[in-house]
Amino acid sequence: MNMKLIWFNTLFLLIFTSCSGLLSSKENTPYVYVSVDDNDYENMEALQLTKVMGNGINLGNTMDACGGGWIGFKKDPLEYEHCWGMPETQKVMFTAYKEAGFDCVRIPVSWLNAMDIANGDYTIDSRYINRVATIVNWALEADLFVILNDHHDYEWCALFGPEETREEAYRVFDAIWDQVGTYFKDYSYKLIFEAANEQWGAGFYHAFSIGGKNYTSDTEVSVWSSSAADFTAFQNKCYDIIEEIGQYYVDKIRAQGGKNVKRFLLMPGYDTSMTYTADRRYKMPQDSANEDIKKLLVSVHYYGPATYSILSEDAGWGKVANSWGTAQEVKEQNEDFAQMQRFTNEGYGVIVGEYAVAMLKQSDGTYVRKNDDIKWMTNVLDNCDKYNYCPLIWECNDYFKRGWKRVKISDWESQDVKCELGFVDSDVAELFKSRSYAVEKAALTSE
């Protein structure tokens, strides 16, 4: 989402940040984490998984931050981890997530930070993948399920659209998932692989640049102003590509062996839109390695209405909204979530991988909570409880403080300083504490 770049303008001067944090740049190889209760998950169905995953949180704007444009590629992992304004990730953050009522965490990653594909280097820097593994281990040790994906990554998925760049797209795709999949193939079943973020769909035809090399698509320019018939044809093409690479992904991960044969795999929806994903043109892959058990899930995001959940201030495409909750707005949200029953009815798990209410920007440049945010989030969580979806809030040190924050100390330097750890506001804390799997399970048992 564009909202993930909210820090970009304000943090441009911090691109040469200090890396004198708590993590040494010295390379360390983490151990392979295996849960003591892994046997419970080996033969678990996707619909059982989404129930025990409870509700979760994203480690946003952290390992997904893209800094290659000014930092370069294959640098110290902390340079990317800091470059969108987030503090260095610490183990204590994950125990705090668990104590706050979260049962799962999504760790978005931009792997191309650690590669240099513009110059033909497709090997992930070992320091970077080891840093990701350290963070994954901390989350698993805190008894959290973990979703690990390929996130922004400079929008390279646009290579899948035009036929002339599709071969290169598969080269990048193979490089990422051959290395990531193999690295984590013996990890606990509580680690879930998500094939991509929001790029599967219209993102196949998105102009982008990486490493000084520009990729453009005439389709991107024309599609939004095209006729309804042309737009339908464009979507049909995107649905076909999703089906092709989705199947390719499942077959690839299963063939890696180890626990990847039965690992839960999360498939991105079309633009992660509930409406486009619920469309019958979207097809889930076949999972021939698990014909008698459902191990696949589908990922969608929820930011609606956009003027309320995405905008922090007025934009060219809309005026910021600071209230939500009319009968019509509630009805529309409920209808959005009801669409995804198409998948649960077929035995597939549904992950609402992101949802959030943007903070409201004040005239002095500070940000405050919007009116009715608790009402909006409560209704989202109620819908997820009703339909057995697993929701994960998009979080970037806003509602939930990570114990550290990144602070500018000069024009060219910043550092991490201590701050609160956990939810700052009691109403938000209570909302999520009451939605943990343990609390909801206890409530059902007592009925």
How should these model regions be labeled?
Residues 17-18:
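C-terminal motif of bacterial Sec signal peptides marking the signal peptidase cleavage site
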Residues 25-104:
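N-terminal carbohydrate-binding accessory modules
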Residues 37, 84-105, 115, 120-152, ...:
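An active-site-proximal structural segment forming one wall of the substrate-binding cleft
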Residues 59-89, 117-124, 165, 307-332:
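Acidic/histidine-rich helix-loop elements
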Residues 69-78, 111-130, 153-169, 201-220, ...:
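Surface-exposed, active-site-proximal loop segments in enzymatic domains
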Residues 88-110, 336-344, 383, 387-390:
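Catalytic domains of carbohydrate-active enzymes, especially glycoside hydrolases
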Residues 170-329, 335-358, 386-389:
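Active-site region of glycoside hydrolase catalytic domains
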Residues 362-447:
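Aromatic-rich peripheral "rim/lid" segments of glycoside hydrolase catalytic domains that contact
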